[in-house]
Amino acid sequence: MASVKLASLMVLFATLGMFLTKNVGAASCNGVCSPFEMPPCGSSACRCIPVGLVVGYCRHPSGVFLRTNDEHPNLCESDADCRKKGSGNFCGHYPNPDIEYGWCFASKSEAEDFFSKITQKDLLKSVSTA
């Protein structure tokens, strides 16, 4: 009788262990993010969709960006996107290689100035917490 209970308990733990290990590798693409995080959202399986210049929300990359890019006035893939939307003349791409789009600025110098300030702040913040 004890061996039947022990066997049932072993099967229960084995089943539970299989489900837990399957979900360990799954990326959760929810929550707030920054396009400057590397990788964005804590996983390269997720994308950070900006709603502001330095803040966004995490999503799986399945076609979400194409819809968002067309709807958002400042998201761009090229300088032509910015001019077409009337949001600027220059598409400044994020310095994060996981982000394949940029933000519209009035000029290249404005984009360089903004990104240099942000990356310096992030660098100083990461050095001070280390």
From Swiss-Prot:
Disulfide bonds join C29-C46, C33-C48, C41-C58. One of its GO terms (molecular function) is toxin activity. Keywords: Disulfide bond, Knottin, Seed storage protein, Signal, Storage protein, Toxin. Residues 64-69, 123-130 form a propeptide. Major component of both the cotyledons and embryonic axes of mature seeds. Residues 1-26 form the signal peptide. The C-terminal glycine may be removed from PA1b. It holds the Pfam family Albumin_I_a. PA1b binds to basic 7S globulin (BG) and stimulates its phosphorylation activity. Involved in the signal transduction system to regulate the growth and differentiation as a hormone peptide. Toxic to various insects through binding to a high affinity binding site in the insect gut. The presence of a 'disulfide through disulfide knot' structurally defines this protein as a knottin. This is Albumin-1 B.
